[in-house]
């Protein structure tokens, strides 16, 4: 009897997983700026990146360099979506980094959108890129993270 109650209690206490994360590393091989990739979490897929090496914006000393990610929600639920990209040279140094995501609300089931990931300040060696990492983060729309209890 005690085993049944402890199993039931564990089942009730365990919260459902509402968020997902997937990270993949790729070699740098864009063709005309576009590279096909596949990063998937909760049936949400980043399927391509279009890299734009950009220009330096004077007098800000910033760059217009960016990547545009195509994201498809092939699932049955709406998700809040975030995409992060870190680009590395042959020595493992980061030469560009940025993140982007859903502009307003969520990516509905069956929808496709593009997210712009800007590289405004870390961009000067982007031409030396050899590899990059893409992280896709998904969270079911309407799910709330439970706050951690304050320690006393």
Predicted segments, located by residue:
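Terminal connector regions
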Residues: 23-26, 120-152
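Structural beta-strand segments of beta-rich domains
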Residues: 63-69
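N-terminal signal peptide c-region/cleavage motif recognized by signal peptidases
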Residues: 14-16
